[in-house]
Amino acid sequence: MYKAQYLWLFGLVLISRSATERTTPKINFTTVVGLKTTPAMRSSSASSLGGSLPMVINTWNFTDANFLAWRILNVTQGGLRQTRNAVVEGCTRCEQQQCDRTVGYGGSPDELGETTLDAMIMDGSSMDVGAVAGLRGIKDAIRVARHVLEHTKHSILVGDLASQFAQAMGFRSESLATPESKAMWMEWTAANCQPNFWRNVHPDPSISCGPYKPKATPLTRWKEDRARTEYSIGHLNHDTIGMIAIDAANNIHAGTSSNGARHKIPGRVGDSPIPGAGAYADNEVGAAVATGDGDIMMRFLPTLLAVEAMRAGKKPAEAAEVGIRRISKHYKDFSGAVIAVDRLGQYGAACYGMTEFPFVVSNPSKTDIPSRQESVKCITGKEAVNVV
């Protein structure tokens, strides 16, 4: 059932290949990945760009995922009725390629050495959501999320029972471990499980592995404990793919896929599958996607904040800053980014805790280059004091 459902899509992409190549320059991916077609934007004063539809935009320099999504979007004129296919298959490409080992199988093993997956797809027309969290033994996370959206009245399925649902829908169960993920886990355990996500437990999590038990510690000390064992979030950790596709009729889908935080406590769910945290879409306004320290970001629903800021009149770049500044007010060591796009295709981004944040854009533009990489300079600690 699962294979049959996607054979038609594969056929459409092949059929459109020759037509697409007649209108699209051949791409040297080595060149495109290193390309900055737009001067780096400083997020504290960035102007929003674009305004052309249809479009696909995604986090990080995941160019292949964007390029496939763009081709699928162009199966029909103006991308009509293809935004869901574009986002799902674009993110699937990243899952298959194990982008930065932070998306898909074989990356970010938890404390027990297991890789689990989170993913979401949101329809900006109906406001329907399909998501999976802690998905075990199924590689096609965002395709399973699509089945949650299309075949259930629920929004999120989690854990083993999400895997059972996937199998009932025709997905194959298989190990998500690879020699690389096993080696990553063994290296971590050999280093006394450092760093990790525990606090206020014994034995001391900063120097030893568990099992841990809670200890009676004054609540005022938790920040000190957190600092000793906290991860450096950024490249190669928490690099969720978030993708937005908009067609010429302003129909929007937004989606995410991630294998979560490396060496997370088993059972942990990040921001990626949470509507308003990992992604949010509303045809009346636009959409936003986020990436970074999900445990912190999900507490602020930054993609919902960005969409609502655009609804209130802010430009996309300004809207992306809203959540970033609010988070950084409370968490000075936080690291993350938000991309915001309005319904007309204007886009902007903001980031914090990094030097620069790359993203990939495809739209009808003066350069006529699909899947071009752009970047934004990140807000510094001093700039972040002006909270929106």
From Swiss-Prot:
GO process terms (BP): protein deglycosylation; proteolysis
Entry keyword Transcription: no
Disulfide bonds listed in the record: 94-99, 193-209, 351-378
Catalytic activity: N(4)-(beta-N-acetyl-D-glucosaminyl)-L-asparagine + H2O = N-acetyl-beta-D-glucosaminylamine + L-aspartate + H(+)
Superkingdom of the organism of origin: Eukaryota
Pfam annotation, one family: Asparaginase_2
EC number(s) stated in the UniProt entry for this protein: 3.5.1.26
Entry PTM: Cleaved into an alpha and beta chain by autocatalysis; this activates the enzyme. The N-terminal residue of the beta subunit is responsible for the nucleophile hydrolase activity.
Signal peptide boundaries: 1-20
GO cellular component, one term: lysosome
Active site (UniProt): 240
Gene3D superfamilies membership: (Glycosyl)asparaginase
Record keywords: Autocatalytic cleavage, Disulfide bond, Hydrolase, Protease, Signal
Subunit structure as annotated in this protein's UniProt entry: Heterotetramer of two alpha and two beta chains arranged as a dimer of alpha/beta heterodimers.
Protein name, entry field: Putative N(4)-(beta-N-acetylglucosaminyl)-L-asparaginase GL17147
Taxonomic lineage: Eukaryota, Metazoa, Ecdysozoa, Arthropoda, Hexapoda
